[in-house]
């Protein structure tokens, strides 16, 4: 039996690169092949809407997680990491395999002192880390050289 994949990413209604990537995957045959399900964690708008999306995503995630094998987390920087870190920690508690697909807009805040702890924890709990380019591999290896999981472009 093929593994089932929960995809944790921003909403379909949010503009941006992560949404575009997940929508593209959703149209591919691998989406059905691996029984993928999109957990929408964030939507642009007022604070109440953002909180609503996060809370409903956490509830949906907790209900579905026991029936899935892999959690594929799409993450940018800053608040995206704060949200997605929660999902990764829960997945680890359930002994799920975790893929972190890292696509931030810039490396500027990648390893700021206030931010680096959480991003490193997210990377370290992943079984596989996907990045957008060879340059990202270099930056991540400079900031987190002991990454235990595989790092792929």
Identify the residue ranges that each predicted region occupies.
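Donor nucleotide-sugar binding/catalytic pocket of nucleotide-sugar-dependent glycosyltransferases
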Residues: 124-153
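Short acidic/histidine-rich motifs immediately flanking catalytic phosphotransfer sites
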Residues: 66-71
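N-terminal subdomain of nucleotide-sugar transferases
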Residues: 1-43, 95
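A short, charged, and often flexible helix/loop element on the N-terminal side
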Residues: 36-62, 73-84
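Membrane-proximal helix-turn-helix segments that form the acceptor-binding/catalytic region
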Residues: 87, 93-94, 112-128
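A short, histidine- and acid-enriched strand-loop-helix "catalytic/donor-clamping" loop
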Residues: 76-80, 96-113, 128
């Amino acid at each position: 039996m093929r593994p089932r994949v929960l995809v944790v990413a921003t909403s379909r209604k949010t503009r941006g690169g992560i949404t575009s990537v997940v929508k593209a995957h959703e149209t591919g045959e691998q989406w059905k092949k691996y029984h993928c399900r999109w957990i929408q964690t964030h939507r642009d708008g007022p604070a109440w809407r953002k909180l609503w999306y996060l809370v409903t995503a956490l509830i949906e995630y907790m209900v579905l997680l026991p029936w899935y094998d892999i959690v594929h987390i799409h993450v940018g920087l800053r608040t995206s990491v704060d949200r997605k870190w929660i999902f990764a920690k829960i997945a680890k508690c359930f002994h799920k395999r975790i893929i972190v697909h890292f696509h931030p807009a810039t490396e500027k805040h990648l390893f700021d002192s206030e931010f680096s702890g959480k991003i490193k924890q997210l990377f370290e709990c992943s079984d596989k880390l996907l990045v957008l380019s060879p340059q990202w591999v270099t930056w991540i290896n400079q900031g987190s050289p002991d990454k235990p999981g595989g790092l792929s472009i």
